[in-house]
Amino acid sequence: MPKITAIQTIRTRAAGTWVIVKVLTDQPGLYGIGSASDHYRAKTVITTIETIAPLLIGRDAGHIEDIWQSIYTCGYWRNDSILNTVQAGIDMALWDIKGKEAGMPVYQLLGGPTRSAVMAYAHAAGDDLQALEDDVRRYMEEGYQVIRCQLGPYGGGGFIDAEQARLPKNHWGHSRVFDDEAYLENIPKMFAYLREKLGFGPKLTHDVHEHLQPTNAVTLAKLLEPYRLFFLEDLLPPEQIHWYRLVRQQCTTPQAMGELFINPHEWMPLITERLIDFVRVRVSKGGGITNCRKIATLCEWFGVRTAWQEGGDNDPVNQMAAVHLDLASSSFGIQEENHFRPEEYAAFPGHAVLEGGYLYANEQPGLGIDVDEDQARALLDPELAARSFYMAEDRRADGSIVRP
């Protein structure tokens, strides 16, 4: 059995927000890679990996579950974003090693394929209804069957200018204001327009990004019921998940939730009480393949489907880990798409192929994806990577922050 000899990190993308874990073994040429990317705390993730690495040196790389449990408890306090990310990156790398050692793709080790390809949904957006319609039609022509629809940025449709908002005389200088009532008016109008123009052929989704107050969130879910969404995403923040009981009592609009989840006690009640229809944990924030396959199995018995979170700040390795889970899981529902630049694809040979609304894995052993370290490091802009990044703040008229 191969033994772990070193754990390395490769920081890449222009802003340095991608962290790729590389686990080396005592068998020549046998290593695995995983995703430990964090858009806002990449340097913290790297430091944590360096702290945990001595615990794992000399361990059997095939003892994946045991190593997962060791990392989970090694700092006593657990279930936090950084630790989960570190845990996930190492876990993916160990599954990659296991697959290479066995000579088969990871999805085969997880029980074999339950489908030939992974259906993905596209991200359509526009600053006005016509631009959004055009973008939706473009994705339909590309073959996508499920398309997310947004009016501009997250919260779009709910932003009003300072004059409309009637800011207090001592306001803090914010010029763009998020208003719940504007959102409740404009998003149903958006879907009414799209259904009138496109009919009910395309399956449509929308991401609230947790911008609404809970009672208004319930109202929105009810207002969107006539438009038969594929799902309504992140209607409520993790702190307010108990409101999903009221959402379920009030309407049948399918709910997708979990992008910010890091703790089992966030997703477990929503799944076991059937309060959501899709769970959207990010594989690299949910503890990796080992833990996310357990989430997928739990979903299977309660009629909930998976929709692992991807989006623009994820990397090709995390995407590939999600694809392996999707292929092997009977509770799979849909996979969020992710587009990368040509030079980013070039740095990750063997990446998943996105075509016609489907993601395709390859038949190579392990995850089937590798990292070209020279090309990956060439993507890094040292000046940009030295900066700190923070989640953008949206505010209400009185200056209070809207939780993203």
Regions found by a protein language model. Give the residues of each.
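Ligand-binding pocket scaffold of soluble enzyme catalytic domains
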Residues: 13, 28, 63, 101, ...
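Extended hydrophobic packing segments that form well-structured cores
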Residues: 367-404
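Metal-dependent enolase-superfamily TIM-barrel catalytic cores that perform enediolate-based chemistry
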Residues: 117-245
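Metal- or metallocofactor-binding catalytic centers and their adjacent structured scaffolds
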Residues: 27-102, 398-403
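Shared catalytic-loop signature of beta/alpha-barrel
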Residues: 23, 47, 52, 66, ...
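Conserved, mostly hydrophobic/aromatic
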Residues: 4, 29, 52, 90, ...
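N-terminal amphipathic alpha-helix/helix-capping segment at the start of soluble metabolic enzymes
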Residues: 1-14, 20, 99-100, 104-116, ...
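Structured beta-strand/loop patches that form or line metal/cofactor-binding pockets in enzymes
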Residues: 1-38, 340-346, 398-404
